[in-house]
Amino acid sequence: MHLTSREQEKLMLFLAGELAAKRKARGVKLNYPETIAYIASHLQEAARDGMSVAEVMQYGATLLTVDDVMEGVAEMVHEVQIEATFPDGTKLVTVHNPIR
């Protein structure tokens, strides 16, 4: 199987997001890379599921709370940006202040 660089990045993001989700489910507070991966992978899947850009942006702000991440991480994450694949093409999605 041959994957393009973009496909490899998406796969790595998915794997990192899955690892972060498992840790969150066990009650482990997420560090910075896990937090970004968790949010980004959920945004990718929401886009593939057919949500609009606006819906994905709103959804991204509901995924994590301050209690889900290590101390100081919420203050470090001002925005998360991804290029997501929607039914009508690839679009840039930005979620401002995703941890509330």
UniProtKB/Swiss-Prot annotation:
It is an enzyme of class 3 (hydrolase). Coiled coil: none annotated. It is found in: Cytoplasm. It comes from the Bacteria. Its EC number is 3.5.1.5. One of its GO terms (cellular component) is cytoplasm. Keywords: Cytoplasm, Hydrolase. Gene3D superfamilies: Urease, gamma-like subunit. InterPro entries: Urease_gamma (IPR012010), Urease_gamma/gamma-beta_su (IPR002026), Urease_gamma_sf (IPR036463), Urease_subunit (IPR050069). It catalyses: urea + 2 H2O + H(+) = hydrogencarbonate + 2 NH4(+). GO terms for biological process: urea catabolic process. CDD domains: Urease_gamma. One of its GO terms (molecular function) is urease activity. Pathway: Nitrogen metabolism; urea degradation; CO(2) and NH(3) from urea (urease route): step 1/1. Belongs to the urease gamma subunit family. Heterotrimer of UreA (gamma), UreB (beta) and UreC (alpha) subunits. Three heterotrimers associate to form the active enzyme. PANTHER family: UREASE. This is Urease subunit gamma. It comes from Haemophilus influenzae (strain 86-028NP). The gene is ureA.
